[in-house]
Curated annotation (Swiss-Prot):
Catalyzes the ATP-dependent transfer of a sulfur to tRNA to produce 4-thiouridine in position 8 of tRNAs, which functions as a near-UV photosensor. Also catalyzes the transfer of sulfur to the sulfur carrier protein ThiS, forming ThiS-thiocarboxylate. This is a step in the synthesis of thiazole, in the thiamine biosynthesis pathway. The sulfur is donated as persulfide by IscS. GO terms for molecular function: ATP binding; CCA tRNA nucleotidyltransferase activity; tRNA binding; tRNA-uracil-4 sulfurtransferase activity. The gene is thiI. Pathway: Cofactor biosynthesis; thiamine diphosphate biosynthesis. InterPro entries: Rhodanese-like_dom (IPR001763), Rhodanese-like_dom_sf (IPR036873), Rossmann-like_a/b/a_fold (IPR014729), ThiI_AANH (IPR020536), ThiI_fer (IPR054173), ThiI_N (IPR049961), THII_Thiazole_biosynth_dom (IPR026340), THUMP_dom (IPR004114). Keywords: ATP-binding, Cytoplasm, Disulfide bond, Nucleotide-binding, Redox-active center, RNA-binding, Thiamine biosynthesis, Transferase, tRNA-binding. It comes from the Bacteria. This is tRNA sulfurtransferase.
Amino acid sequence: MKFIVKLYPEIMIKSKPVRMRFTKMLESNIRNVLKKIDEDAKVQRQWDKIMVKVPKDKPELTELFAERLAHIPGIHHVLQVAEYDFETVDDIYQLALPVYRDMLKDKTFCVRVKRAGQHDFNSIEVERYVGGGLNQFTEAKGVQLKNPDVTIQLEIDRDKLYMVSQRIEGLGGFPIAAQEDVLSLISGGFDSGVASFQFIKKGSRTHYCFFNLGGAQHEIGVKQVAYHLWKTYGESHKVKFVSVPFEEVVTEILERIENGQMGVVLKRMMMRAATRVAERMGIQALVTGESLGQVSSQTLTNLNVIDRSTDLLILRPLISMDKPDIIREARRIGTEDFAASMPEYCGVISQRPTVKAVLSKVEAEEQKFSEDLLDRVLAKAEVIDIRDIAVATSERVTETETVSSAAGNEVIIDIRAPEEEESRPLDVDGVEVKVIPFFKLATAFAELDKDKTYLLYCERGVMSKLQALYLQEQGYNNVKVYRP
């Protein structure tokens, strides 16, 4: 069994040198992917297509090869074919008759032929000859050129005949490495996953940068998204996953920055950190999942202010997409379930965000940061080969106990941001309630009575769980999540 890989039309219209270069890249990418399935896979480049051969003694690999080819960027469609030698048009008919005789019983059909090479016949003559013979010597209802029950597809290349048994639609785009590398800021949500996919499809080797706002569970979830995107669509090339611990930055923002500027300042700090990561990796562009007007930091004014934090090009492929369209695309590429279960954070952004940030005012606020804040944060960044994530995703984060009521000997810790706690204070009869914002909990917890059990509370229950997981990782087992 063979596959004929058809190049994406945008590759076909390139100049001869560019087309040849892209075709070589695609051949190499296909080989890299299929060799991981079976070392005996054969991949051969031709001028207008790429031939892939399934090992004769391993027909069971046919379906797997087809599935992998459908997810490699740069492919328009794939034809699953059987190959035959022939000399005359009658040979073609004689080869087609036993293959299609039973298939055509009581059905209308037509024959479509594509031909390359020097022959004493043309494609239409083959269609007429083969179609006439099949109509006469099978139990078909007859020939029907428009909307037939069966379309017989034949491809002729010099002295080879290919009978098409299946057409598989490809991903489109350009082969990976056709464009320069990019660094995608990934959060695990709908937007960043789709944005990352768009650049994989466009031919960029897409690396991932994750800003960890607290908790192993969130990081493992984001790693799963990145690994899925790489394994499904970009496996032909090695990429990096960079995890930057950003809790310290969030703490300083919440303690020092004016409330309305917090969201824009956080994004600017992320861009600065990502820029330094990208420069170390020799990457000249960042990718984000921002969409115009989706949240307060994504107005034109605020995006302009955010862009001023870096000299690198910031690419936003989803800038004009609506959220339902983004979710549909996430569903199509397989990241929807990951994104739907990804944590949201309580109080990480401001309660009264500005939609028209003023650059001078934002820069003045940023002067309040510790001088070496980003240096300290980036010194703790973890850079791993994405292939190693498979090991990490097999690990299970300890399940944190969640309770709906508190006993008199337990202490509730309200970890909400100060604005939330002040506007909706928590009061539980007969139970002590301490107020420790989540961004101070890691250091403050060490000073608490170790003989007591502490129940962490936030309105959504996500940050409290992540903080409990973090404390458990530090060796504290007297922690639960409080969800009244």
